[in-house]
Amino acid sequence: CHNLWLQYRYSMDESILRNTVYPTLRRAINFYLPFLEEDGQGILHLKETYSPEYGNAKDCNYDLALLRWGCLTLLEACRILSINDELCPTWQHIADKLTDYPQNEDGMMIGKDVPYNRSHRHFSHLLMFYPLHLLNAEQEGSKELLEKSVEHWHSLPDNILGFSYTGASLLYAAFGEGNKALEKLNGLFALTLRPNTMYMESGPVIETPLSGAQCVHEMLLQSWGKKIRVFPAVPSQWQDVRFQDLRAEGAFLVSAIRKGGKTTDIRIKSLAGEPCILQTDMENPVVKIGNAMLVPQGKGVY
């Protein structure tokens, strides 16, 4: 469902939202409703569910993150599509009252009373950081929690595989940590690249190379939260970088150039006429082509 939502966001094709995303996500989220129970303080908890390839847990972080994101996204879809769904109050109640993510001194847990204490290749328990961005760099304390969680995840090395390195790279990139993102991506290369430059790990799977490519995309361009971030997590050793026509949410094509560690040129083409909010390290940028107006909002946001 999240991938379907991104398909809509990158195209802004409302028919995708109405005919595919909304009905599919509605069914997926409503499946969770019988698993919810309310405590004496009115907080909603999940009964025992399964964290992929790890085990069972109540208040499983994997499901809490997806449920919270799903309810918020359904409410947004109803607003966009002008749908008065009878379940909107239920989804809003869940979004308001769903319990916090279980965590301990090592960061995010698998679920209630289930710490992360054996090696695991997936970052299923960290989806709230990426790709859902429910916890993100714009929130106080989230970065420290992310770093603690990733470091603990990789501190148990027995089942840390290629996908673990790309996952950590994506998580660090989401929080603007370009050097750490590159370090983890290089970990993938050291583990899985062969002398002929081809990837090989265990079976005939492709998700690790694809997520490796996505690591580079996330270093160069991010657009979650309806804000285009150009070069948000570029490693310090990448002093000269350029990309052309990468897609951003809101149906934008973005190109940019970075020289000597500074962004010198950004070009944005709107394909759907959506509002454009840009974050950049450019000092006092000016519009040279087109009739767009830059309105400073502080901290490099226009």
Features from the language model and the residues they span:
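An acidic- and aromatic-residue-enriched active-site/binding cleft used to recognize and process polar
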Residues: W5, M12-D13, V21-Y22, N30, ...
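Detector for glycine-centered tight turns/loop "hinges" at secondary-structure junctions
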Residues: Q41-G42, D106-G107, A251, G261
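Acidic surface patches and DE-rich sequence motifs
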Residues: E38-D39, N104, S270
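A glycine-rich phosphate-binding loop feature that marks nucleotide/adenosyl-phosphate handling sites
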Residues: K47-T49, W91-D96, F231-W238
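Active-site core of glycosidic bond-cleaving carbohydrate-active enzymes
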Residues: C1-S15, N19-P23, L64-K227, T264
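Residues that flank catalytic or metal-binding motifs in active/ligand-binding sites
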Residues: G42, D63, H125-L127, R242, ...
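Acidic/histidine-rich catalytic neighborhood
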Residues: R26-I80
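Non-catalytic C-terminal accessory modules of carbohydrate-active enzymes
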Residues: N179-Y302
